[in-house]
Amino acid sequence: MWNSGFESFSSSTYGGAGGYTQSPGGFGSPTPSQAEKKSRVRAQHIVPCTISQLLSATLTDEVFRIGDVEISQVTIVGIIRHAEKAPTNIVYKIDDMTAPPMDVRQWVDTDDASGENAVVPPETYVKVAGHLRSFQNKKSLVAFKIIPLEDMNEFTAHILEVVNSHMMLSKPNSQASAGRPSMSNPGMSEPGNFSGNNFMPANGLTVVQNQVLNLIKACPRPEGLNFQDLRSQLQHMPVPSIKQAVDFLCNEGHIYSTVDDDHFKSTDAE
């Protein structure tokens, strides 16, 4: 799945004693040569994050941090709300439901006719890897990889990766052999940290239900969205899962059938 595109952050990054190891200048235990260096080498590992955490990151001496964790290359998972293509780049607005949508810019190779330059359509869930940037106090990502999700379990897996990576990176280096960090770390619930509560969609729906609801909301036709059209836009999703989500949304009053039992419209539509 995702790891076929590039090397992601994983537990295999850690040494046998449980400590985090990497090249000089990163998160490894300080050595005399590192301490003497005035210039820093930017962290090279990829850290899974949420948009809310990226927006709360602090920038000091050209280094982004979330709490005590230094970040540069990150991954996020979310749904594309808007996509706009220019001659040299594509700008996406990506929403993971933890904060307002974030701008993600992907530069395109004008001499490359392959599918790498194709625009991923709105209402598609994707995983993005890129570099965090800040311009005029507005944070954004410069993406070097954008991959549509093939399995919605990847969304859940990303959440677990976020929590795990932050726990390991924020673990005191002096306790590298002391075993796993406690899950009851009080810092985990502080603003900007990797609290599990940040990952719950505000409307209480699952990822699948949200994706179905968003597609129905986005349909401008008076009769609403046809179920066959819904299926064609969610080809990566099993049909029973789509039907189950539609039934749930109907029963909970989020959508309703219109001209027949196969056309649906959002109750929030004007």
Swiss-Prot record:
GO BP terms: base-excision repair; DNA replication; double-strand break repair via homologous recombination; mismatch repair; mitotic G1 DNA damage checkpoint signaling; nucleotide-excision repair; protein localization to chromosome; regulation of DNA damage checkpoint
Post-translational modification: Differentially phosphorylated throughout the cell cycle, becoming phosphorylated at the G1-S transition and dephosphorylated in late mitosis. Mainly phosphorylated at Ser-23 and Ser-29, by cyclin A-CDK2 and cyclin B-CDK1, respectively during DNA replication and mitosis. Dephosphorylation may require the serine/threonine-protein phosphatase 4. Phosphorylation at Ser-23 and Ser-29 is a prerequisite for further phosphorylation. Becomes hyperphosphorylated on additional residues including Ser-4, Ser-8, Thr-21 and Ser-33 in response to DNA damage.
Residue segments, region Disordered: 20-41, 171-192
Keyword set includes Phosphoprotein: yes
Gene Ontology CC: chromatin; chromosome, telomeric region; DNA replication factor A complex; nucleoplasm; nucleus; PML body; site of double-strand break
InterPro entries: NA-bd_OB-fold, RFA2-like, Rfa2/RPA32, RPA_C, WH-like_DNA-bd_sf, WH_DNA-bd_sf
Positions bearing N-acetylmethionine: 1
Disulfide pairings: none
UniProt crosslink position (Glycyl lysine isopeptide (Lys-Gly) (interchain with G-Cter in ubiquitin)): 37-38
Annotation: DNA-binding region: 74-148
Modified residues (Phosphothreonine): 21
Domain of life per record: Eukaryota
Pfam family, one: RPA_C
Family according to the record: Belongs to the replication factor A protein 2 family.
Subunit structure: Component of the replication protein A complex (RPA/RP-A), a heterotrimeric complex composed of RPA1, RPA2 and RPA3. Interacts with PRPF19; the PRP19-CDC5L complex is recruited to the sites of DNA repair where it ubiquitinates the replication protein A complex (RPA). Interacts with SERTAD3. Interacts with TIPIN. Interacts with TIMELESS. Interacts with PPP4R2; the interaction is direct, DNA damage-dependent and mediates the recruitment of the PP4 catalytic subunit PPP4C. Interacts (hyperphosphorylated) with RAD51.
Function: As part of the heterotrimeric replication protein A complex (RPA/RP-A), binds and stabilizes single-stranded DNA intermediates, that form during DNA replication or upon DNA stress. It prevents their reannealing and in parallel, recruits and activates different proteins and complexes involved in DNA metabolism. Thereby, it plays an essential role both in DNA replication and the cellular response to DNA damage. In the cellular response to DNA damage, the RPA complex controls DNA repair and DNA damage checkpoint activation.
Name by which UniProt lists this protein: Replication protein A 32 kDa subunit
